[in-house]
Regions:
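Short amphipathic, basic-aromatic surface patches that mediate peripheral association
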Residues: 72-84, 725-759
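Residue-level recognition of secondary-structure-to-loop junctions
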Residues: 117-124, 128, 134, 785, ...
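C-terminal membrane-anchoring or membrane-association module
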Residues: 4, 10, 891-904
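Enriched for extracellular/lumenal, surface-exposed ectodomains of secreted and cell-surface proteins
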Residues: 128-161, 799, 803-817
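Repeat-blade elements of multi-bladed beta-propeller folds
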Residues: 191-216, 252-291, 313-360, 381-412, ...
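Blade-level signature of beta-propeller repeat domains, shared across WD40, Kelch, NHL, RCC1
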Residues: 665-715, 721
Length: 904
């Protein structure tokens, strides 16, 4: 048993049971109060005694660790408490430190059932005491805000003006030690292949969990196409699955391809990935409506949602809605609600139609069943996914005139649309629900119901007379907006940027006051050139402008409005067709849209060029002179770009790649023959490849290692042949050789895209170790598997006994590691010496010549010396004579004894 583990003592267990009992009692009382009928007020008001309690969560805790104090009042919950409204108890905690000093925590406000908890971090070693104080309370029904229409029929109205007397708890002692209390042992991040669900006990695994929700969900601040989690460092293919007919068609048509796409009628692949499932709309070429569901880890089709007729859920039942037609997936959502009585996330899918874009339909992402709809969705504003996962749209509205503006800041909220009652509003962080008829602060969307979204505003507040549009949103902090201004032959119109407060006050309400307002003069656009304002980067305090004609960029200070760097040196002429940008970790990433292939990185605060990426060229088939570069996504310090111009020729030119670039230095990490964009989730890249109209999943796959030893039982001093295989266990090419990262591109193109098998492909490094019979570990060294997946190693075991040999592949960017173990035996070598034959017969030869002593082989000698064994015919004659005399003596003695007994 580990000496570092601290187990709960029976007293502590009893304390936990007491806490649980009190909480259950409080909840029971709360339920009683909820359903208690209203009665008339008390005249005169009543007075109640009270009992205050406090319990430290841990009797013993380490210095610097967080202690939790649980406190409650030993009476019924506050009589007017109802949801977020009504009275609350308040408490103070007096903590006495070992050195005699004291500190007070509070006031601490209870929850609706009359209790609460808080944290305290001790800084001294020794015994602490804590005492809870309740200062008393006269019920008035409103410290936490009036219950709407509070009156005689309201919860607890009869208790108004009743008084609850002050009380103080007994002191409770807890001990702080120098040694820390043992915490929950965190499961290490996976080194083997993993799939969802991620066990909820693995709190520390959250950085590797990532979904692709589409829409504004992938927007990080003012930037777009961001992904969470990890991203693959290799073009290793997990699987591919047909998306449609593709590739070369028929000898009659030569090198012409199956239909892929065009400027107007394209095969659009915009997948959404939720909890290990891929959802994507049926390609336009199929001439049918609906969407597919694939398993992220295998590519297996799980479901097809047919929207050309009645919608059937995965469970086999028809939706009561009767059918959903002409719908296409628009985005996905994870709604993470932390409510008083309900906590957790809900994965949803949303669909729309071109005919009714302001009506959204919501589906259960697990069962695929239709749930409800929102009509009159706000179509204006800047889309943002809130911290709780709600889909928000921030918008500026002028309720007045241009001459006399009356400006309002609105935040339209999908969750508010489903909860709206007309009298209550949910806070943006999702802390409270106000759905009509719902008194339990729970999320319960009505099934097959259409909600009116015209009132779904979680924020609708008057603001100062600002101009322009919203540029960036930081939920619960601020919103930045403004105008671009102009600077040309007609004169200068200063631009303006401003920020409004989004922090809520103590009651949870937001008053969007003006935080700051700056003006600036944009770069000159004289001479019929186009200067465009870019993104606003509040973290680095910069905003910028770009010009496609001059291929230049200017940086401005968000604090002063002054130009702080630029213009940059003109770069790729192909920037004329567009200069899309991203801000990532203090860098301004610039792409040459459509026709150019370059990617540039500038220091966002100084304008210094950090690196420039030029795609590698193969052949001269691109009609643009180089390979176009468009952003797919940024994730895990990697920039993914693809070469897919607006117009695709038939046959398509060759040399289009999905490319992965190191965001810190612009070095190409890998590329793969792939025509089309891609998205990232759970460490995988998923994209449609127009070269063959197949869906590819790139990422780190599982591997398998085998091992054999020959012979199974060897003689000491003989060699053992250790051999085995290391193979790819990914669904797409299970059982094929595992190949080194350096050979992955060519190998994957060979396996999946009918390209030539690489002649110089190498396998992976295998480390072999042995455990000898004495328990000693021996490193047998490394060997590399070949392009067939085989490896081999010769070894001579030093001592006899049973050995265990392990072959380990530690993994690579393409594969997770694997290992295998085998046992074999080594027998002790036989002690064999050269035979010594008898000497020829001679009267002078000694009959008692000594035999040659056997030579003992050293235990660790690689080649034991033979043992000399004398032949049976060489036994000396004296030996036989001695044996005969002994027998005669024994017989004579026995006879003498027998005669003596007879005479007696």
């Amino acid at each position: 048993m580990s000496k570092n583990l601290t187990f709960l003592e029976p007293k502590h267990q009893r304390k936990q049971a007491l806490i649980a009992a009190v909480l259950i009692l409080s909840l029971t009382l709360s339920a009683f109060v909820v359903f208690m009928p209203a009665i008339t007020a008390h005249t005169p008001p009543w007075n109640y005694p009270t009992w205050t309690y406090v319990v430290p969560y841990n009797n013993i805790i380490g210095v610097g660790q967080q202690e939790k104090f649980i406190f409650w009042l030993g009476v019924s919950p506050p009589p007017t408490a109802s949801g977020i409204f009504g009275d609350r108890w308040s408490f103070y905690l007096d903590v006495a430190l070992p050195d005699g000093t004291k500190t007070t925590l509070g006031p601490l406000i209870s929850d609706p059932v009359g209790g609460g908890y808080t944290f305290y971090t001790p800084t001294q070693v020794g015994n602490y005491t804590v005492v809870a104080r309740f200062p008393g309370k006269t019920i008035n029904g409103q410290p936490n805000g009036f219950v709407p229409n509070f009156g005689p029929s309201s919860q607890g109205y009869a208790a108004v003006n009743d008084t609850y007397a002050p009380s103080t708890s007994d002191p409770v002692t807890f001990t702080v030690t120098q040694a820390p209390l043992a915490l929950w042992p965190e499961a290490p991040l996976p080194t083997q292949f993993w799939t969802r669900p991620i066990n909820n006990a693995n709190f520390n695994w959250w950085p590797i969990a990532a979904n692709w929700l589409g829409g504004a969900a992938q927007i990080a601040g003012p930037t777009s196409s961001f992904a969470y989690g990890t991203a693959p460092g290799s073009p290793h293919v997990m699987w591919r699955t047909p998306g449609d007919f593709g590739g070369i068609m028929d000898a009659r048509f030569g090198d012409a391809l199956t239909y892929t796409t065009s400027h107007y009628e394209g095969i659009n692949f915009s997948p959404y990935i939720l909890d290990g499932r891929i959802y994507y709309n049926a390609p336009n070429s199929e001439m049918k409506e609906g969407w597919y569901v694939l398993d992220l880890y295998t590519g297996q089709q799980l479901y097809f949602f047919n929207t050309t007729g009645p919608v059937q859920g995965a469970g086999g039942g028809f939706d009561a809605h009767g059918g959903v037609t002409q719908q296409s997936l628009a985005f996905a959502q994870i709604l993470n609600l932390q409510l008083a009585n309900q906590m957790g996330g809900y994965p949803y899918l949303w669909s729309t139609t071109a005919a009714t874009p302001n009506t959204w339909l919501m589906y259960d992402a697990y069962t695929y069943n239709y749930i409800c709809s929102i009509a009159n969705v706000s179509s204006a504003g800047t889309a943002v996914y809130g911290k709780s996962g709600s889909i928000l749209r921030y918008n500026l509205v002028n309720a007045g005139t241009t001459a006399a503006p009356q400006m309002w800041l609105q935040c339209w909220n999908t969750t508010q649309a489903i909860w709206w009652t007309g009298t209550q509003q949910m806070y943006q962080n999702g802390d409270y629900s106000g759905f009509a008829g719902n008194n339990y602060a729970s999320w319960r969307p009505f099934l097959n119901y259409t909600f009116d979204g015209s009132h779904a505003f979680s924020l609708n507040a008057s603001i100062p007379a600002v101009q322009g549009s919203i540029r960036a949103v930081r939920e619960d902090q601020f919103v930045i907006g403004g105008t671009a201004g102009s600077n040309n032959e007609n004169g200068i119109v200063p631009g303006q940027l401003w920020a409004l407060n989004l922090k809520a006050d103590a009651s949870g309400k937001i008053n969007p006051t003006l935080l700051w307002n700056i003006t600036f003069t944009p770069p000159s656009s004289a001479g019929n050139i186009t200067v465009s304002i870019g993104s606003v980067d509040p973290e680095d305090g910069v905003f910028y402008f770009t010009c496609v004609q001059t291929k230049q960029i200017w940086g401005y200070s968000l604090a002063t409005g002054q130009q702080i760097w630029g213009p940059t040196a003109p770069e790729d002429p192909m920037k004329y067709y567009g200069m899309p940008t991203n801000i990532y970790k203090g860098m301004l990433i610039v792409y040459t849209y459509l026709c150019g292939g370059s990617v540039y990185s500038y220091n966002i605060t100084t304008g210094q060029l950090l690196w420039r990426y030029e795609p590698t060229q193969i052949g001269y088939e691109s009609p643009y002179g180089d390979y176009p570069a468009q952003l797919a996504c940024i994730s895990d310090g990697k920039i993914f770009i693809y070469s897919s111009p607006l117009w695709r020729t038939n046959p398509m030119w060759r040399g289009s790649y999905l490319r992965c670039i190191n965001a810190s230095n612009g070095v190409e990490l890998w590329k793969m023959l792939h025509y089309g964009s891609a998205v990232v989730a759970d460490g995988f890249v998923v994209g449609w490849n127009y070269y063959d109209n197949e869906i590819y999943c790139y990422g780190k796959g599982p591997s398998a290692t085998t091992i054999t030893a020959s012979p199974a039982v060897a003689t000491q001093g003989d060699n053992i042949l250790i051999q085995g295989t290391v193979t790819d266990q990914s669904p797409g090419a299970k059982g094929t050789p595992a190949i080194a990262d350096a050979s992955q591109e060519a190998w994957m193109e060979y396996l999946y895209e009918q390209q030539a098998q690489p002649a110089n492909a190498t396998g992976v490094l295998v480390h072999v170790t042995a455990m000898d019979p004495n328990g000693n570990s021996q490193d047998l060294g490394n060997t590399t598997s070949d392009a067939s997946g085989n490896y081999a190693l010769m070894w001579t075991p030093p001592v006899p006994g049973i050995y265990k040999v392990t072959a380990s592949f530690t993994g690579s960017n393409a594969y997770y590691g694997s290992s295998a173990e085998i046992a074999f035996g080594v027998s002790k070598a036989s002690s064999v010496a050269p035979l010594v034959t008898a000497a020829p017969a001679s009267t002078t030869a000694p009959t008692n010549a000594p035999t040659q002593a056997p030579t003992q082989a050293p235990t660790a000698a690689p080649t034991p010396s033979p043992v000399v064994i004398p032949p049976a015919s060489a036994a000396p004659t004296a030996t036989y004579i001695a044996i005969g005399l002994a027998v005669v003596i024994i017989v004579a003695a026995a006879a003498a004894i027998a005669l003596r007994r007879k005479h007696n």
